[in-house]
Every structure is written in C-alpha cells, then in structure tokens.
C-alpha cells in the first residue's frame, strides 16, 4: 500500500473507523500494513495484506457515502487505489458556511473556495445524480453560482439540485440573487429545491416540463403572478412544496393546476389571500401553516377526502390528508423521507391532525397505513379514518384479513405499540368485520386516549341500531375511553 504523505495514517483512521464489520487494519512501525486477527488466546499478524483496497469500487463508494464530500475527497491521499474513487460518487454536498465567515468574501473566480468547488465538479467522472450547494451572502456578481448551475445541469446532467442561500448573523440585510434566464429549465433536471432566494421573475423557470419535484422554501417574489407563471411552466410536477411570500398583496389567487400532482405541502403563504387547487391525482395534502380564510381555499381533488376541515383545530395545527393507495408513488416516498421529519423538528408544532382514506380489504393499503401511522412518535391530536367503499371479491381476502387482525391483537400492535392519538373519527363506517377488528385493536392497545367517534347518522334506522349495539359492546371493554356514534 502506497502512502502519499505522513498524514495518511490519520486520514486512514478517519475513513476506516466507520463501525463497519471489517477486520482491523493498521500500520506497523515499519510502515508496512498488516491485518490483526484475534483468536481465543492470541493475535496473529498477517503482513502485506491490504483488504480495504482489494474491495470493489461499489463497496468503497458505500464507505465514502457515509462521509461528507470534503472528507471523501481527502481519502484520495490514502493510496493510489483510493485516489479517484471519490469522483464516482453520485451525490455531492458543497457547504460554504464552513469556509466563508464574513461578507467580504466574494462568490467569484477570486475566491479560493469557489474555485475549488469548480475544480471538484470538473474532476468528477461518474454519474452525478444529485448535488447540494449551500452558499452565504456575498459581494460581487452572480456569475459563479450560475456557472455551477450550467455545469451541473448541462455537462453533468444532474437530476436533483438543491440550492440554498444561507443568511448568517453577520449579514442581516436582504440581498437578491439573479438567476440567469432558463438556467433552471434544463431537460435533465428532475428535482429542484430553492431555499431563501428572491425570485424577481419566472424567467429562470420557463419551460420546466421535465421537473417532477419542485420545492420553493422561503422564496420571495414581487407579486403572486411570478409564482403562478412558474407553476404553469411545470405541468408534470408530482411533488410541490411551497413556503412563499409576496412583497405586496393582490386579489389574484395562487393557482395550482397540475394534473399529475401527487403531493402538495404548504409550509407557509404570506401576503397571499387565496389558493385554488385543481388536480385529479392528488393523494397527499399537507397544510403546515395557512394564512387565508376558509372560504379562500378552493380544493378540487376527487381522490382526496376529509370531513374535519383545516380550520377546526386552529391555523397553527398542521393538518395532513392522505389517500392511502397501493400504487408506488413519489409522493409517499417524499412524505416518509422528508415531510414527516420536518414535522418532528425541534420547535416544530407539537400537535398534528391527520386524515386517511383506506380500503381495509386491500393488503397493500393496510400495510401502507401501518407505515404512515407508525411514523409518528408524538401523540396525534386527531385522526380521521375514512373507509373506502369496497367493491372487490370478499372471499379472496378473507383469510388474509383474519390473520392480520389476529396477529395485531396478540403480538403485533397496529400500527405499533407507541402510536397514540387523542381522538379518532370514523366515516363511511359500514359495520364490516374488518372495521370492527380495527376498532378493537385501537381500543385494546390503548391507542386512542380520549374519544372514538363513529358516524352512523347516514344509515337506515335498522342498520344504525345494529351498529350502535355493537359499539356499545366495545364501550363495555373499558371505561376510560369514550366511544360514541354521531
């Protein structure tokens, strides 16, 4: 094994000390590598064995993926074998907050950090799937960041791009950044996240039919028309996350008319009086904070159902409506991997209201319901369950249903042993065995803390009395929980 400098040993320690189940590899005093193997009564040294360097590139890349981009690049000094491994990494993160500590630094060719980032991108030889650039306030032109965007999208064909303008304590003035026209519209770009920018016009995002995911967080525009034009230029969006603000109010609503949209998250809307949402495919609607009045939200989405509206618990309680589907969806992945985590951040809202629509006769939907509910480590304020009308053959799923609920009742709580909710509301309740089995699970496990409400008022009198009698038996199982029909 070759070493490029005397500091290689510390670099080795940093790279290899990852807690992976590999043998201990070290350097002896004579600088020759050996492997230490431990038996019951003694240690054996096997010299001149470089196990790490003998691993294939894909395994080495897994090791590098656990390091920051900066640390991964430093492994190039470990040996010849590691020299070019980093430039095959599929994900790079450039965080300039670590290197620029005052506003006198410029984001241009004279800045050594900016120059180094350019060199790293140019030297990358693999498929660069995604890239994150976090930069700080600067003086001077906009050329360097626009240059990186062109390099990543046009040359590297990067699919996922995240740009964040970070404000430090040394810079409290609002500064603007001018993206070049069409700079964010390259056909290779599938996902774009912008954080903390002033979007003067929609020109950087014209003709973005390629985009599937768009996140605009802490984005300011002069007026609502800028955002409407941006959204109109992205007809194929499947995930849309908005945290936006306008300098001035207008009577024009924010219009979201994306037919393929699967997930819509509204983190905040400031100086926006009305919202019009029209989409035929929406499965997940997450309202984290909304400032408009109830009558100023128009929602046309046939797949999304909820009865407890977003204003019942107040404007500061996040409400999520989720149509559980058996289809694989980018919306479900985004919710599980990103949005849920945002709701559990420190200082985030402690209370959440959740509405779900589910077919209990569909095994895939039930497992996905378990996944969604199982995410929550905090108690949910309200859970609304809307049972879908089931028109499928009952006999095909009967044995599966029985086994599922029996397992859940005895040894596998649904969704897990920690999930808690203050109040559960059940709609479109038909009185089926599956629905009563789910109710029994939630009651016996102590999942519901205060109330369980079942809507039966739409049923004929005879059926309503039958269901209410069955509910009364459930109430008899315990005394702490209130179970009522309405």
Curated annotation (Swiss-Prot):
UniProt cross-references to PROSITE patterns, sorted A to Z: FBOX
Domain of life, source organism: Eukaryota
InterPro entries: F-box-like_dom_sf (IPR036047), F-box_AtFBL13-like (IPR053781), F-box_dom (IPR001810), F-box_plant (IPR044997)
Pfam families the UniProt entry points to: F-box
Residue ranges of domain F-box in the record: 49-97
Transmembrane intervals: none
Protein name in the entry: F-box protein At1g80960
